[in-house]
């Protein structure tokens, strides 16, 4: 089967209806009125795709966020998992509590309202359609798709409990017209937690949470393959972006994009990061690390013999706009300190969705779909 115009422009002994109606045969119409249009995908995105689908920043004003409403998947907790070894324990479901679905939905509604109250458009991911439903970690939407320079990349999840989140995420984005500009394929793996835009020209990528088998050569190569795919997609769009592929086979990277409050500014003790990464951030972006006082810091056990315990500053949650953050309730000292350094703090009550009750943070539960550009005046 030929495409439009492929053979129809060839001369024919038959009556040429194009020539008869317009004075020009089809070939002449192509040549005169229909040249190829040389244009840039990113530059014409708003015209062709309806919106500026860009979120390659973690501090530009948030315009659209992707959330997932807890559903029937949480009723499966306590039953044998649909994946091997088909264990009914809470640990096998990566849960610390038997979920109360009504309570989780209430917390989700609190979170959605908090965004809407700040003028953020809320996009809800399509529900889990597996039989039985099992996607109890789908509330962490930041892990499944991630911004490229424009549009979204569908990532490829690590483990059974998160497999197949990719499809409803893709369908949700497609339904609202958000361009999916790539997917992680083959045996490549990548999750969004440790993929972080530090600004529009710098992004770091590492392993999300190392497992018992992460150090196996085949798994290491699969992780690297996924990271390289992400980097290629980004650099095809914008060759100027510096993508740092960070090693991730022991301690987790202390992700600076989870500690941001403003452009090139994070609440972090740089001694908790790889010194080479710190040197790069300072040299490339003149990065400012603000060290919080001990009384508002959180203590973490790293399982790294070189630094078993680290202190991290108060959670900065989701940056709504520069110097304005959305965080869970419950840390009045941290809020007061953040306000003392000029950060506006918006709080939301959502304990069943975030730590310590659950396995992710409020940042994990927010997929950035549209953000304004970062301020360039400082």
Q: Language-model features: where?
A:
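The feature marks the mature, well-folded catalytic cores of soluble enzymes
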Residues: 2-378
């Amino acid at each position: 089967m030929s495409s439009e115009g492929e053979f129809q422009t060839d001369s024919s002994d038959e009556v040429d209806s194009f020539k008869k109606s317009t004075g020009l045969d089809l070939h002449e119409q192509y040549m005169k009125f229909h040249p190829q249009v040389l244009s840039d995908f990113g530059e014409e995105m708003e015209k062709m795709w309806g919106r500026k689908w860009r979120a390659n920043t973690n501090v530009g004003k948030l315009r659209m966020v992707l959330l997932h409403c807890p559903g029937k998947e949480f009723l499966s907790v306590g039953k044998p998992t649909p994946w091997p070894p088909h264990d009914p324990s809470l640990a096998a479901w990566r849960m610390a509590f038997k979920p109360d679905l009504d309570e989780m939905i209430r917390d989700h509604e609190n979170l959605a309202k908090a965004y809407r109250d700040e003028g953020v458009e809320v996009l809800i991911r399509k529900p889990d359609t597996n039989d039985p439903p099992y996607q109890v970690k789908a509330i962490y939407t930041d892990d499944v798709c991630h911004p490229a320079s424009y549009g979204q990349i569908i990532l490829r999840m690590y483990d059974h409990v998160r497999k197949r989140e990719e499809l409803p995420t893709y369908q949700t984005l497609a339904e609202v017209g958000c361009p999916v500009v790539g997917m992680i394929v083959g045996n490549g793996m990548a999750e969004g937690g440790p993929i972080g835009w530090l600004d529009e020209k710098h992004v770091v990528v590492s392993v999300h949470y190392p497992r018992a088998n992460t150090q196996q050569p085949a798994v290491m190569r699969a992780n690297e393959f996924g990271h390289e795919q992400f980097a290629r997609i980004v650099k095809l769009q914008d060759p100027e972006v510096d993508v740092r592929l960070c090693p991730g086979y022991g301690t987790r990277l202390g992700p600076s994009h989870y500690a941001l409050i403003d452009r090139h500014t994070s609440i972090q003790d740089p001694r908790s990061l790889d010194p080479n990464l710190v040197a790069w951030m300072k040299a490339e972006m003149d990065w400012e690390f603000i060290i919080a006082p001990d009384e508002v810091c959180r203590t973490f056990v790293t399982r790294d013999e070189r630094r078993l315990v680290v202190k991290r500053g108060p959670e900065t949650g989701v940056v709504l706009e520069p110097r304005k953050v959305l965080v869970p309730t419950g840390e009045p000292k941290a809020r007061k300190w953040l306000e003392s350094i000029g950060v506006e703090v918006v709080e939301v009550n959502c304990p069943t969705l975030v730590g310590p009750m659950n396995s992710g943070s409020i940042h994990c539960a927010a997929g950035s779909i549209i953000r304004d550009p970062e301020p360039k005046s400082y």
